[in-house]
Design a protein with these regions (language model features):
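Bacterial N-terminal signal peptides
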Residues: 5-15
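Sec/Tat signal peptide C-region and signal peptidase I cleavage site
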Residues: 16-20
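Residues at or immediately flanking beta-strands
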Residues: 31-33, 85-87, 373-377, 413-415, ...
Length: 445
């Protein structure tokens, strides 16, 4: 289906691309080299590259599959017949950073944040955590998948850690039937595996069981689980395919399926960001152009068509639930929530890189929908503190930090609220969960 939708989308956007500034075409070799995440490199990366080539007015755009698994070239042709090639190798996120280090890639694709040791390793390329270098191009969710006829409907993150570490060995221990649990996981190079390890295993001091069957390909893993009645695996959202996804609970959160609305706000416990990393001292204008294109409305339309969650801002109705404070219920009765949460750098009141990118998107929405004058409310949340009043104050201060940025562009707010540690979306027992709980929601009337 994706292979049908994407060409139609790209053709539909053709008139919009005619005015793009032309990029230089190298005399020899590829115009751009991208290495890293298989989650990005399988479909999304190639689709974004095709969109950029189309924007450049190239003709006969197509993919050429390499003899090596998970490698391909995206090829186009100028009106004068010159061939333009973009190389994509998708062997896992860590391979992208290694390729930046040895200068065999111009751009790294990653389905997890860059690690501290990689930052140090690549410091000669500049600060890859800076806003210009670290670019969030899409949101994805790790789906926990079962055989489609498995009756289980939800699992919590503690259970997941015990299952994938091999401590819980049978479906009967989970309240089901079927005997031994068969584990399926991505390989060690995969950002998908790194994300699962960081969100589920490492915070609980556990490691993946040696009995797990490992895969470089997301599609092959999903297909294997869907054919194994005793199987369980984790996979990027677009690769659920014929398998069954279950709802996930983290700490005191509500059970959440990997729904678009919950992933867009990053409330879903196993949501994650997908990145391009662009070196500061890179000399390749095609890399700069692809990052800019990916962040544009045209690029985000391709993100959505590829099965990931675009960062396009939308207003959503929210249904009341028993865990909501009265003040929050009063807001949802009359307002709609935007599909963006602002989050912060760890241990800081500074907006993180995605939040900085989202400021302009939220501002565009507010202006386009004529919400500048007292029709926007910011709602802050935080992690649990021993003093609930302090938690409430800190959550309101986070909302004020977002307010300070948006008032510069003329937004007059209706209300700024802070609800402290109410309504957690993640467990407060780990740093990752505390960071997710420190968030600011945007509501419009």
């Amino acid at each position: 289906m994706l292979r049908v939708l994407l060409p139609l989308l790209l053709c539909g956007l053709l008139p919009l691309f005619a005015t793009a500034a032309e990029l230089p075409i190298p005399e020899r070799g590829p115009a751009l080299r991208i290495q890293g995440s298989n989650t990005i490199g399988a479909d999304l990366g190639p689709a974004l590259v095709k969109g950029l080539l189309l924007e450049q007015g190239l003709l006969k755009i197509h993919s050429e599959v390499s003899d090596r698994d998970n490698e391909q070239q995206i090829v186009g042709q100028t009106a004068q017949g010159r061939r333009v090639v973009v190389d994509i190798a998708a062997h896992g996120s860590s391979t992208g950073f290694a390729a930046l280090k040895n200068a065999s890639a111009d751009l790294a694709a990653s389905s997890r944040p860059i690690k501290d040791r990689e930052l140090v390793d690549l410091e000669t390329l500049g600060d890859l955590k800076s806003p210009n270098a670290e670019q969030v191009i899409a949101i994805d969710g790790l789906a926990i998948i079962l055989h489609p006829q498995n009756p289980l409907t939800q699992l919590n993150t503690e259970q997941l850690a015990r299952i994938f570490s091999g401590e819980m060995k049978t479906w009967e221990e989970l309240g089901g039937t079927g005997g031994p649990v068969n584990l399926y996981a991505r390989d060690d190079h995969s950002g998908t595996y790194d994300t699962f390890k960081e969100l589920v295993l490492s915070p609980r001091g556990k490691a993946l069981a040696g009995s797990a069957k490992r895969f470089e390909s997301s599609e092959q893993l999903s297909d294997a689980v869907s054919q194994d009645r005793q199987g369980i695996g984790f996979i990027g959202l677009p690769y659920v395919r014929q398998a069954k996804a279950v709802a996930i609970v983290d700490g005191n959160s509500q059970p959440m399926l990997p729904l678009n609305s919950l992933i867009a706000t990053e409330d879903y416990p196993l949501s994650r960001r997908l990145y391009f990393y662009l070196p500061h001292n890179g000399q390749n204008p095609w890399a700069d152009a692809l990052v800019t294109f990916a962040q544009s409305s045209k690029g985000q339309a391709i993100v959505a068509a590829s099965g990931f969650i675009a960062q396009t801002v939308q207003a959503m109705n929210v249904a009341p639930s028993p865990q909501m404070p009265d003040g929050y219920r009063a807001i949802i009765e009359h307002a709609k929530r935007l599909s963006v949460n602002f989050r912060f750098e760890e241990g800081s009141a500074s907006l993180d890189n995605k939040a900085r990118q989202d400021l302009s998107r939220v501002l565009d929405y507010i202006k386009q929908h004529d919400k500048l004058n007292k029709q926007v409310t910011l709602v802050g949340f935080g992690d649990a503190k021993t003093d609930s009043q302090r938690a409430a104050l800190l959550s309101r201060l986070r909302a004020m930090a977002v307010r300070r940025e948006l008032v510069k562009s003329g937004v007059v707010f209706r209300e700024i609220r802070g609800f402290g540690a109410e309504m957690p979306v993640a467990a407060n027992s780990a740093d990752e969960g505390r960071i997710k709980n420190r968030r600011v929601e945007v509501w419009v009337y």
